Amino acid sequence: MRVGAFLGRSLFSCSHVRGALVRRRTPQHSCSFHISKPRSLSHVVPVFSRAPLFSERTAMVDQHGKHTYKDLYIRSQALSKMIIQLLGNPSHNNTPERVSFLCPNNSSYVVCQWAVWMSGAIAVPLCKSHPPSELKYVLQDSQSALVVAEESYTNVLSPLAEQLGIPVLTMSGSQNLHPSELLQEIKISQLDLDWKDRGAMIIYTSGTTGRPKGVLSTHYNLYSMVTALVNEWGWTKEDSILHVLPLHHVHGVVNKLMCPLWVGATCVILPEFCPKTVWQHFLGRDVPSINIFMAVPTIYSKLIAYYEQHFTHSNVREFVRAACQERIRLMVSGSSALPVPVLERWQEITGHTLLERYGMTEIGMALTNPLHGPRVPGAVGAPLPGVEVRTVTQNPRKEGTSYTTHAQGDSTGTMVSVGLENREGELQVRGPAVFKEYWNKRLDTQEAFTSDGWFKTGDTAMYKDGTYWILGRTSVDIIKSGGYKVSALEVERHLLGHPSITDVAVIGAPDVTWGQRVAAIVKLRDGHALSLQELKEWARAVMAPYCIPAELIRVEEIPRNQMGKINKKQLLVHFYPQ
């Protein structure tokens, strides 16, 4: 079932005729707006409720132009009315309905997200690069009651939704109307809901350890994520961020979209990542200026490659460095480990030391290097305000599992157990941003937490020299070889310093004698050759003997997902099928 709606600046209404939903054009009228401000911002509210504070400011800039906060709010309210017309009133349900949506990287995403929340429903963002089978899985697993899709995606989503009996609301960008022409009069008021514990968003994990799980966050979880980052990274309404990431992960949704919209700042969003366009924004060449940039390490590597190829003259390079230092106040890297050679080269090029931080779908951001002050390469800093972290070792017992705590801290400091300094262990997190549950997976949710309420991240970490270090996923990045524990991420950081290696993934290959052996999968620079013996000789100067790769696999490309992550379990199955 497909129902016409609006995208950008067009609107259609719908009504029931003989059991079918039909599309009817709304007449154009002049219009006055009465936007009532939220009663209080001291309680938990969704980000859309802040829009009236910044009514005429530019909220977003996309390929269609500029969009004010009032523009986004009015368009969202109109779409919300259509969602309510189709679903009844989701806000009246004890368990809100789920609404899955798929939009391009432009203002339509915000309009749809806000509209779902205005309706009292739970937003389930879909990934445009996922194959139909994965999209169908999310629709089915989330038990979505409605699919909202921009018209270019309906050919993919409509057949899937029809198989599952889910109606589809189509967003169309064919018209070019001003918001004042959308409705005769619209009065926007604060929904009378208790937002705090209400479900807000389900984001599906990348599924590197099995089928993706739906991570349900409440409005309080999102509020906590956003306000912590806004305060810690100094967001103001004068900021402007360049957005080039997908919009189905916390990094792209919360850090790069909700944070600027919370404070009245501007989000300049690109349809897709393009190195040339990003450099144009950095240098202010006939494009909107920006002063914040966040990305994954893979993107920084591609920006460096573009720089090396196109900015060859010394005067140009001096200009690039000066422009980046003058125009940009903050550059952040996350979602996967940042290779130190990339950090160092980026610092040489732009004068910026990338701010590394640590987070995941289930917890938002937990650790960050300081906005001001020294940033330790390879480390992820200290807990954000409101977040508690600890590193522990499990002590299995008949009656359950107890933990020995090595280090535990919050934003005010970290306490280290005597005799357990610099000891690695599982990183566990507690705080208001930690998710509510895995959708419809009670046992998985229960197993994800300790008996005293700490979320088990599955990452191995260490507190050392006043900062936290992530050593990798316990399941795939900690290689147990001959009694030693080897961090695959540490080995990767070293190998990326080799002049012939441009990309690398280190895995633990099965070994009858040692349990596991260190295997390096590498992409070499064009025209370069490298043997295992040559790599071993080079590595002896920079790595402990037990960390040196025992196997070298050369590939043309190392597969990564949109967030730059490598599925190492798939690599193990591919190269070691038995």
UniProtKB/Swiss-Prot annotation:
GO cellular component term, pick one: mitochondrion
EC number: 6.2.1.76
Keywords, comma-separated and alphabetical: ATP-binding, Fatty acid metabolism, Ligase, Lipid metabolism, Mitochondrion, Nucleotide-binding, Transit peptide
One Pfam family per UniProt: AMP-binding
Annotated ATP binding sites: T205, S206, G207, T208, T209, G210, R211, P212, K213, D459, R473, K565
One of the GO BP terms on file: fatty acid metabolic process
Gene Ontology molecular function, alphabetical: ATP binding; malonyl-CoA synthetase activity; medium-chain fatty acid-CoA ligase activity
Range of the transit peptide: 1-19
Catalytic reactions on record: tetracosanoate + ATP + CoA = tetracosanoyl-CoA + AMP + diphosphate; malonate + ATP + CoA = malonyl-CoA + AMP + diphosphate
Annotated signal peptide: none
Family, per entry: Belongs to the ATP-dependent AMP-binding enzyme family.
Role played: Catalyzes the initial reaction in intramitochondrial fatty acid synthesis, by activating malonate and methylmalonate, but not acetate, into their respective CoA thioester. May have some preference toward very-long-chain substrates.
Name of the molecule in the record: Malonate--CoA ligase ACSF3, mitochondrial
Originating species: Xenopus laevis
Name of the coding gene: acsf3
